[in-house]
Amino acid sequence: MRETRTLEFKESITNTFLKTVSAFSNYVGGTILFGVDDDGNIKGLPDARQACLDIENKINDSITPQPDYMLELQNSDQTIKLTVKAGLQKPYLYKSKAYKRNDTATIEVDTLEFSRLVLDGKNIRFEELPCKDQELSFEILCRKLKENIRIENFDKDTLKTLNLYNDDNGFNNAAGLLADKNHFPGIDIVKFGENISIIQKRSTFENVSVLEVYEKALEVFRDYYQYEVIQGADRKKMEKISEAAFREAIANALIHRVWDVDSQIRVSMFDDRIEIVSPGGLPSGITEEEYLAGKLSVLRNRNLANVFYRLGFVEIFGTGITRIKQLYAEALIKPDFEVSENAIKIMLPIFEKNVDLTEDEIVIYKLLSKTMLKPISEVAPYVPFGKSKTTKLLKEMCQKGVITVEGKGKGTKYIIS
């Protein structure tokens, strides 16, 4: 047993546990075990019943507002289990400060995080706050609505229907994001060469409508990952990476990121993959497992997501990850998803079908490159079988046309066909 983000051990009762009560209440909840040392060894408490009363009094006297918690006395080993639920009346303060968990530590939140807790406690999202700039134009939004859903009139009633404007506060931040010109960040796209030291081209789209940002990102994608093959009198469009998958990834980055930080969505384009990193981790109330399973039931920017949905840029809310996985169902190398506290990263690999490779052949395939010849010495040490089997599998993969062999003897090298 060890400490985690939602589990803390306290061998004795000191006021430091109150910071953790604040942290658990402000976010996803958690458990504190009293009478257990830092290594998870049960020590017990001298007077567990009195300790239970002391813990209750300390919480009631020190945390505001009152957190939702439950105390359980474990008579068998004289320990106490304190279960703290995520609260609704955020922020929960200890000595006028709010706390959060950082891995297994408890730290004070910064000014930005504190303001987010205040909004969360009032059930207000950043996109709903009044926009700083109230002189906004919406030519791009108007054009897209007329093209995609055939609306005839675009006026303030349209903006009210989309929850972008109200008579009391004017335009909100969601409206600002969709306006032709704004003060918000956007997307920074970099096309790399053989390594990250070689930048072939950089494109940054910011301070314009997120609809324009979305379209510009697609244009850059098409330049690098789509091409035409002439077959007789016909031209056939080919894709190295699925445009549908890229669309989903970019749309998800735009509608699920945090917009109260001045950070760009970063798109790194390589010959064999694309990486999309969006600022902000998962919204409160969603676990990484739920996100990866496509169960994104909590929307950080509901109004913005609604516009993207109406325009047909996304399908059902929260299904982007599932859709991307489906598009790669027959691919040899699958997309990868990474979630951290402050960012979400999606990696879309070059789409290549699994041409009946065995599991061992797939292991080797993933170590080879489409652009660089590799000798067996750069493959064999990284596979879970011997050099002779590796050589045999490479020969079979060559016969299948999956890889190409160049050179002879010790100079033999391999490259993906």
Region locations from a protein language model:
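Intrinsically disordered, low-complexity regulatory tails
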Residues: 66-133, 260-264, 315-318, 330-339, ...
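Active-site helix-to-loop segments that bind/position phosphate- or nucleotide-bearing substrates
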Residues: 103-263, 269-285, 289-298, 320, ...
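ATP phosphate-binding glycine-rich loop and adjacent ATP-lid/helix-beta elements
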Residues: 288-332
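Short, cationic-aromatic polyanion-contact patches
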Residues: 351, 357-360, 405-417
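Short amphipathic alpha-helical interaction segments
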Residues: 384-396
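Short amphipathic alpha-helical interface segments
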Residues: 356-385
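Polybasic/polar functional segments that serve as interface/processing modules
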Residues: 1-32, 36-83, 88-90, 95-98
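Residue-level detection of the helix-turn-helix DNA-binding "recognition helix"
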Residues: 395-399, 407-408
